[in-house]
Amino acid sequence: MSSSTWTPDALLSEARPSLGEDWRPVGARHRVSTLPIVDSLAEQEPLEDILEKTKPSVPLECRRLDYLLSTPFRYGAAYPAGSRFRRAGKILGVFYAAETPDTAVAEMVFNRFLFCAESPDTPWPDGTTEYKDADAWADLIDHSACQHLADRAREAAIEIIRYQSIRDPGGEASLAALTCRAFAEAGPV
């Protein structure tokens, strides 16, 4: 199907339940970012409380979730560049995860690489795929096809998009939770 035929009804006809555990590596930024500027854990706690009060509130439907799961949904401010399933501008957040630990690590490594890289002329490997829209969905820079798909999925009330990781050499699946209602558990397991 071409991207123009991915209507909410067409997407809904392809929707399937999530099949189990999903993976997302997390850092301990809440510990390492503020701990160096205080002398003890006792001093860090009030500092973290102050920082928490400056952040946007967690949406009502996400308040049952641990902060590691709800954080992507609390920031509704203008998002500068967009991501695979989130347009630039003011739009609902997306929680990205993977079906296997290896894929989760591959996604994390790639994102860390992007954060550190300052070589826009670096050539990227080419890949082929059997699906007509997969090339557009796998573009490393232009996420408009995925954002269009996410828009249609939201219209169809689809909560999770399962997609092939372009960063995992094995091509395993990754997941994009479009709403915090997609979580079966309130905290990470």
Give the ranges of each region predicted by the language model.
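Short active-site loop/helix that positions an aromatic residue
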Residues: 105-116
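Active-site and NAD+-binding cores of ADP-ribose-processing enzymes
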Residues: 1-89, 117-189
